[in-house]
Amino acid sequence: IRVYRYAYDTPCDFYADRIRLEPDGRHTFDLVCPDRVIRDCTPGVPGWVNVENCVAAAAMLWVAGFDEAKLRAAIASFSGVKRRFDFYVNTPKHIYMDDYAHHPNELRAAITSVREMFPARKLTVVFQPHLYTRTRDFYREFAEALSLCDEVLLLPIYPAREEPIEGVASEMLLPLIGCPARVVRKKDLTDVLKSKNPELLVTFGAGDIDRFCTQIAGLFAEK
C-alpha cells in the first residue's frame, strides 16, 4: 500500500510552500506535489486551516489522477466547510465570524489568521470551552492562545457527554489570559455584545455557541 503524507507547510509528499497573505485575507501558495509544483494557488476562502484543507483535498485529487488545471480550479473554487471562518457580517464598520476551533492549537491558528486579515481592528473573541476534561488538561494553553486577542468573553464550559469536574470551570482561565477577559452567562451574551458593539468579533467553540450566530449578526444590522 502506497502511503502519502500531507501537511500545511512541512515538507512531505504534499504541502504548501511560499504562503502569502493577499489584501482580501486569503492566502496564495505553491502546492508541492510528488511530481510537480503548482504555483500561485488561492483558495476561495481565508484562513490557515483552509490552506491545509486545500492541500489535503488536492492530494486526494492528485492520487485520483486529476491534472494540474483541474487541481488549480478545484482549489480556487474551494468555499470552505461549515463553521470554519464563516462570515456572518462583513461591512466597513463591523466584521463577525464564527469558527469551530476548540483545541488550543486550532484556536491559536485561527486567531493568528484573523489578526493577519484585519491587523488594524480591535479583536473581541467569545470562546465556549468544550468538555471539562479538555479544559482541565489545556486551560493554560487556551489562555495563552486567547491572550492574542484584545478582549475575551468566556462562556461556561459546554459539557457534551461529561459530568462536571469539581474545580474545573471557565473561570480558571481568567488569571492567565493576558488581555481583558470575563465570564458571561449564555443568556446574557447578546446583551453584553450589544453594549460593547465590537468592530471585529469571532465566536469559537464546538458546543452550542453556533446557535447564537444569527442573533449576534442581527445586533450589527441594528447599528
Residue ranges and their predicted role:
Residues 188-219:
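A glycine-rich beta-strand to alpha-helix segment
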Residues 33-151:
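Nucleotide phosphate-binding/pyrophosphate-handling subdomain across enzymes
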Residues 5, 125-127, 154, 203:
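Structural beta-sheet core signal
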Residues 1-38, 81-84, 88:
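Extended acidic/charged loop-beta regions that coordinate divalent cations
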Residues 3, 16, 53, 57, ...:
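Residue-level signal for inorganic ion chemistry
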Residues 15, 135-136, 163-164, 211-215:
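Short glycine-/acidic-enriched loop or helix-start segments at secondary-structure transitions
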